[in-house]
């Protein structure tokens, strides 16, 4: 006697209403074929449950903008955040159910603001790009640096992804019989036909989440300045088919929303349906839920937009934004702090040896200087 699980029985009922067989087929044959279909579907579901899913999430953004704090909260790790000096890696795991393998999220964080943008080539590879998502964290409390940080980092990722896609296309063309075939990378992002303003936007090549951090400081800004920042980020997010959310690590309710978006990118979970486009509140706008008509034109009162001579809509928004918040490049020009002198990375034995070698080097320099002076006197 055949024995089937409850899953097979429920699937069998569903198939019985949808399965059509020729009238000449005997009832027993129909029954057998339905059982086989049900058993095959159960086996397929079980094999999917046993397959480990691996995704990559790349965090970047404003220097000291709260990236590490946000990541630790999303991973529910009770650790004190430390400055990210260059590029750091960690991972997260989540089980889909009881006694099932845990899905893995590879998590990369870029430190230093825009100064180390060349390092994007490390996490973005031909292997990772097929399941890659990007999180851009922008410090709302420093609006003067916001546009330049955003533009440079997004361009760095765009360039690297394009490079990976191009290499894949070249490899495809080198295969016999594929020279004249048009190649579309399987990871290339394709928007639904009913996506708002589909013909007017430039979708980012991989899923993108823009986070406006330190909302607790930003909400005390002048209302007109808040309006400029909020509308500009709404435009940028919609233009790149990205999600946008404002948050503060001091707000549990806002951080819970961040966790939902993060889990969606890292593990494929539902991101929720919360939507908040009120400029007087923290923005929560999932990709595909905004439009240019809802965003409206750039917010500016003391300049004639027609006099800005913009090349395209994005350039117009940039010029209006930088008219209100001119870029202050001093903060980005500062070099990263020497990690060898940072007390949080102290190693007593190594530091002692380093100090000894430094003293020996200084003594060598002094002796060398004396010998050169002696030579000069002799001549």
Where are these regions (language model features)?
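Glycine-rich phosphate-binding P-loop
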Residues: 55-75
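G-domain G4 guanine-recognition motif of GTPases
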Residues: 137-142, 165-188, 195-224, 244-256, ...
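Short coil/turn segments at secondary-structure boundaries
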Residues: 46, 50, 70-76, 82-87, ...
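Canonical P-loop GTPase G-domain recognition
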Residues: 218-290
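Switch I (effector-binding) loop of TRAFAC-class P-loop GTPase G-domains
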Residues: 42-44, 48-50, 75-106, 113-118, ...
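Short, flexible boundary segments at extreme N-termini or domain junctions of P-loop NTPases and their
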Residues: 1-62, 91-95, 104, 116-117
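Extended non-globular C-terminal regions
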Residues: 302, 306-379
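Inter-motif core of Ras-like GTPase G domains
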Residues: 118-143, 147-167, 179-182
């Amino acid at each position: 006697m055949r024995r089937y699980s409850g899953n097979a029985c429920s699937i069998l009922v569903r198939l019985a209403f949808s399965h059509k067989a020729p009238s000449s087929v005997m009832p027993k044959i129909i029954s057998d074929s339905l059982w086989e279909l049900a058993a095959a579907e159960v086996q397929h579901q079980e094999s999917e449950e046993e397959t480990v899913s691996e995704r990559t999430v790349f965090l970047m953004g404003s220097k000291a903008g709260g990236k590490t704090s946000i990541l630790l909260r999303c991973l529910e790790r009770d650790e004190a955040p430390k400055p990210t000096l260059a590029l750091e890696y960690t991972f997260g795991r989540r089980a889909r159910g009881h006694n099932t393998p845990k899905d893995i999220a590879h998590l990369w964080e870029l430190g230093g603001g825009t100064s180390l943008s060349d390092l994007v080539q490390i996490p973005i590879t031909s292997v990772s790009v097929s399941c890659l998502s990007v999180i851009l964290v922008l410090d709302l409390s420093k609006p003067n640096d916001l546009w330049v940080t955003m533009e440079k980092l997004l361009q760095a990722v765009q360039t690297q992804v394009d490079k990976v896609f191009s290499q894949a296309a070249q490899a495809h063309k080198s295969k016999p019989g594929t020279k004249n075939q048009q190649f579309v990378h399987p990871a290339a992002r394709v928007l639904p036909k009913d996506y708002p303003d589909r013909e007017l936007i430039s979708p980012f090549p991989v899923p993108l989440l823009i986070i406006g951090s330190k909302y607790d400081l930003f909400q005390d800004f002048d209302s007109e300045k808040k309006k400029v920042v909020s509308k500009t980020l709404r435009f940028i997010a919609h233009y790149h088919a990205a999600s946008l959310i404002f948050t503060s690590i001091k707000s549990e309710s806002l951080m819970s929303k961040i966790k939902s978006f993060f889990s969606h990118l890292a593990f494929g979970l539902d991101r929720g349906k919360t939507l908040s486009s009120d400029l007087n509140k923290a923005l929560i706008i999932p990709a595909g839920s905004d439009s240019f008509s809802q965003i409206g034109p750039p917010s500016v009162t003391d300049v004639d937009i027609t006099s800005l001579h913009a090349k395209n809509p994005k350039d117009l928004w940039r010029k209006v934004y930088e008219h209100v918040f001119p870029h202050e490049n001093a903060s980005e020009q500062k070099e990263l702090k020497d990690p060898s002198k940072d007390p949080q990375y102290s190693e007593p034995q190594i530091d002692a040896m380093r100090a000894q070698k430094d003293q020996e080097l200084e003594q060598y320099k002094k002796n060398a200087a004396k010998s050169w002076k002696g030579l000069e006197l002799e001549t």
